[in-house]
Amino acid sequence: MLGGCVVANVNLNKVFNFYEEVPLSGTLRSFISPNENVCFVVKTVRDMAVFTDKRILVADKQGSTGKKVEYYTIPFKNIITYAVETAGTFDLDPEIKLILSGGVTIELKFVKSKNMDQLLLKVYNLINNFMIG
C-alpha cells in the first residue's frame, strides 16, 4: 500500500514473437471495433496480433493448454517513441521496440523466416504512417 492506495505488481514490459502473416480468425474478429479497419494479422505458434489502422491487438495465450488468453490493446496514439532493430550476426531476430505513455515497453520480435524483413517493414510502416502521417 502506498499513500492509501493499493499498488499492483504488474509487469509492464512485454515481448511478443511473430513469424508469419495469417488471415483474421473469428475469435479475434469479435474484438475489432466497427470503426477500425484490419490491416493484417501475424502469429507465432500460440499468439496472434491484429494490426488495425488504430491499434495493435495481441492475443497472448497463457498456460500449458493455451485455453486462457490475455488480450493486450496497444493504441497507436499511446506510442511515445519507437525503434527498429535489424538482425545481426548473433541476434538473428529483428524487432520493433515501442515505448508507450507511462513507461511501458513492448517488443515485437520477428522470428527468422523468409518473409521476416517484409513483415517487419509492414509493421513499421503502419506505425510510422499513423505517427507522422
Language-model features: where?
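Pleckstrin homology
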Residues: 115-133
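Anionic N-terminal interaction surfaces
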Residues: 2-49, 113, 130-133
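Canonical phosphoinositide-binding patch of PH/PH-like domains
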Residues: 100-119
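Phosphoinositide-binding peripheral membrane targeting modules
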Residues: 32-48, 52-104
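A general marker of short, structured functional hotspots
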Residues: 12-15, 72, 78, 120
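Intrinsically disordered, low-complexity segments enriched in small/polar residues
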Residues: 1-2, 64
